[in-house]
Every structure is written in C-alpha cells, then in structure tokens.
Amino acid sequence: TITCDVCKIYNEQGREAVVNLIKEDVINSVHHIESLTGCKFNDPENPQLVSVRSGAPVSMPGMMDTVLNLGINDEVAATLAKKSGNERFAWDSYRRFVQMYGDVVLGMKPQNKTDIDPFEEIIESVKAQKGVKFDTELDVEDLKLLVKLFKEAVKKSTGKDFPVNAWDQLWGAIYAVFDSWNNERAILYRQMNQIPESYGTAVNVQAMVYGNMGNSSATGVCFSRDAGTGENLFNGEYLINAQGEDVVAGVRTPQQIMTEGSRRWAKLQGISEEERKAKYPSLEETMPECAAQLVEIQARLEEHYRDMQDMEFTIQDGKLWLLQTRN
C-alpha cells in the first residue's frame, strides 16, 4: 500500500518527487508479493500479475479507478495459457487489461454519456460479426483480435505503442490512481458528501486472483445488511466466469448470493422457480462452501468494524478470496 500522504506529495510536487521518494519501497514491496506467491513480476516465464486499486480513507464507491491483470503482454499471455491449460482465460485477461489501462491510465475513458467508448465500440463490432450477444461467447481467436484492435485504438488515440514492460505499466497505474482523486466524479462526490480534498487516496497493489478462469470461478459484491433498510440480511450478487466490474456493468444478469434473495428476485422478475434454478441459481446453490464462507466472513467483519460492510470477492477455481471491504 502506498499511503494517502504520498498522494498529497504527488498533488503538491508532481510525479518525479513521488518516484524519488517511493521507488525503492515499491520495488521491495513487489518483491515481497513475489516471495508469497512464488511468481515473478515482469518475468514472461513465471509471471506475477497484480491489480492496482485506490484506497480512499472515506468510502467513495465507484468514484476511483482500478486496473486489473497488470503485468500482462503477448509473452505473458502465452505463458498463462500454457500454465493454466486455458487459452481463453489468458486472452480474456489480456483484452480486459488493455481496455482498462487504456481507459484509466491513457485517458481513453468517455467523459460523459454521449461520448463513444472506443473499446466497447470494437467489442460490439466483433460480437456483431460473430453473431453473438455476450462477451463470454467470444472464442480465443476473437479475443486475440480484440487485443490487436484495442492496441491499434491506443496507438491512434495516444500516438504511442501500448506499454509492454510490467514496471512501466505499474508506474502508469499508480499515477492514474492518484490522478483519479481529482477526476470530475470524485470531486463532485466529495463536495456532495463533505469529504475534505486534503485526504488524498492510497494505492493498493495486490496479487491477482481470477474470476474468469471458467465455470468454477466467479466475482461478486455483497453487503452484510440490506443497504436500503439496514435490516440484518446478508445479500449480494455474483457472476460466474467474470472479472472486475462485470457484475455492475449490465452486460450479463448477475445472480444472487443467497437462495432466499434469489427466490425474492425471481418473483419480482416474474421468473418461475424452475427457470430460476436452471438459469439464475444462487451462489448458495452453485458453490455452497464459498457461500458459507462469505456468511461467516461478513459477520466477523461487521463485528470488527461495528458498521455495515460492502465487500468485493473473487472465487478462483472454487477458492474464495476477499478483495476489499469498506464501511
């Protein structure tokens, strides 16, 4: 974690001052991650990918930027495919990274609702040519094509080739998270919620876990209580074979974590119990052990923080990982 104090220095003195201050610590911390995982950052033979996410001292949901799968390039994608035995997962992770990095770090994200997202435009075009509706229906060759077209879009927009060195990617993402403290959405959110501008944001660099490795993997968000009423009712949503913001992006219909919530949702949607179980089963039904772990974890976290918790999680090959929690 790079602390909020560094963000203040970044805002006051700029990038060079921050690099001089924290470069050695960042390198040592990445080596610490490597010692825990047994993988190597910026090594195509045994690659360690990371996520870079913000950590504001006061919760600002959806306002700050995150980059996943950082450290990937053509060689790393080939290694991931070989090691995992899942070529589609490797290239899906790669196309997601180029899209996120282009949006967050290289400034290609649409600034308002009328702007066209160049990456989404490319995805929709490829899906239309293939005659499919969902991203999950694209095969390996389609995903390789997306990576190629995304990189061409980056070159056209920025005039530069997409960065392939993991350290260059990492520093770009660190700067972008600090910059996101002063993006229009974040400034407006702080004004509306009386959050001091001086707080700044931390940057969290985490080892990646993957919710997009297949049907035994998933990603989701959950709340220890009903966010609308405060009722003591654990609830949340998840998607099989997904990653990052897929759950809230509206591309696929997310499923409920608890069976009770799933039945309630189906009733509101006019979906029969038979169809619900076949098409939209709860996590409790598809991965009961992970659901039980989540129930236990949310209770422990709420007791510790003495407040309702908003959590993000990933399931990789049937193993649950909690990514973050906030009050």
Where in this protein do the model-derived segments appear?
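Nucleotide/phosphate-binding sheet-loop regions of phosphoryl- and nucleotidyl-transfer enzymes
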Residues: T1-N327
